[in-house]
Amino acid sequence: MARLYYDTDANLEPLADKTVAIIGYGSQGHAHALNLRDSGVQVIVGLYPGSPSWPKAEQDGLMVKTVADAAAAADWVMILLPDEVQKAVFQGEIRPHLQPGNVLLFAHGFNIHFGQIQPPANVDVIMVAPKGPGHLVRRTYQAGEGVPCLFAVYQDASGMARERAMAYAKAIGGTRAGILETTFREETETDLFGEQVVLCGGLTALIKAGFETLVEAGYQPELAYFECLHEVKLIVDLIVEGGLEKMRHSISNTAEYGDYTRGPRIITEQTRAEMKRILAEIQSGQFAREFVLENQAGKPGLTAMRRREAEHPIEQVGRELRAMFSWLKK
């Protein structure tokens, strides 16, 4: 089993008298910036001129500068931007201002692991990745708790990179819950695999296939939506709270029996073989190259797929049914 590290295993000393630039002020950016500030760290937010997040960050009491100015003023730079824009921003606005001994941080290893960003040899390169959305990272911190984090070291120029990563994780509240050491490679490859095979790609394909099967068999689309999409949250909440065991303890015997006897007929040996092929594409860099080329071309494929998926019948049915859900309007 992996070892978890807690508050007593880390200290904030590496952050003493240091300025941290948080590049981006989205879901993770606002949580990191505010938690760091509340932990006594000097924080600057780096944004592009005219960013709608600029006044919001200022209203939150933070100093805001352009990305280049923030990078120039900081000792530590955390890049919390979409994967596809990080390379250009790093090359044009961050790299020219990095000084020996600085710390370059990421919350996902994609651009480092796949060579899109090649940092200078005289800076530490580390990762701190909360395993939860930004609003949860912030809310739990304010409640005196935290969200578990992964941390990793890619480049240790100072000899203190590991301690620095743990200090940052502590400052955003991670060590209150526990932090797990990993590598950029492991985090990147497992994250992409989980997204593609289970959480996003696998789940949405399963939901749509179930919906389509019922509708094609003559059942009302509304019932198909309830059974194949709406109730997913009910099951997932049980799994998150107590694992598969709690979910199976909470459902009916009929549902549990169907789980054991029919589930394996959906995830077959052929499905598992395809999972392995997808993992191999991630490990080889094939997916990363494909994604980079897609973005360089202006995202024509992604745009077309978004448009096509938005027109799926399940979306129209869902919009109509969700209008009935009063709890979603609160």
Swiss-Prot record:
Record-annotated active site: H108
Q: Which UniProt keywords apply?
A: Amino-acid biosynthesis, Branched-chain amino acid biosynthesis, Magnesium, Metal-binding, NADP, Oxidoreductase
Co-factor: note: Binds 2 magnesium ions per subunit.
In what residue span(s) does the KARI N-terminal Rossmann domain sit? 2-182
Residues reported to bind substrate: S252
* Residues annotated for Mg(2+) 1 binding in this entry: D191, E195
GO terms (molecular function) for this protein are: ketol-acid reductoisomerase activity; magnesium ion binding; NADP binding
| Entry keyword NADP | yes
What biological-process terms (Gene Ontology) are attached?
isoleucine biosynthetic process; L-valine biosynthetic process
Binding positions for Mg(2+) 2?
D191, E227, E231
To which pathway does this protein belong? Amino-acid biosynthesis; L-isoleucine biosynthesis; L-isoleucine from 2-oxobutanoate: step 2/4; Amino-acid biosynthesis; L-valine biosynthesis; L-valine from pyruvate: step 2/4
Q: Which family does it belong to?
A: Belongs to the ketol-acid reductoisomerase family.
Among HAMAP family, the record links this protein to: IlvC
Q: Which PANTHER family match?
A: KETOL-ACID REDUCTOISOMERASE, MITOCHONDRIAL
The identity of this protein, by name, is Ketol-acid reductoisomerase (NADP(+))
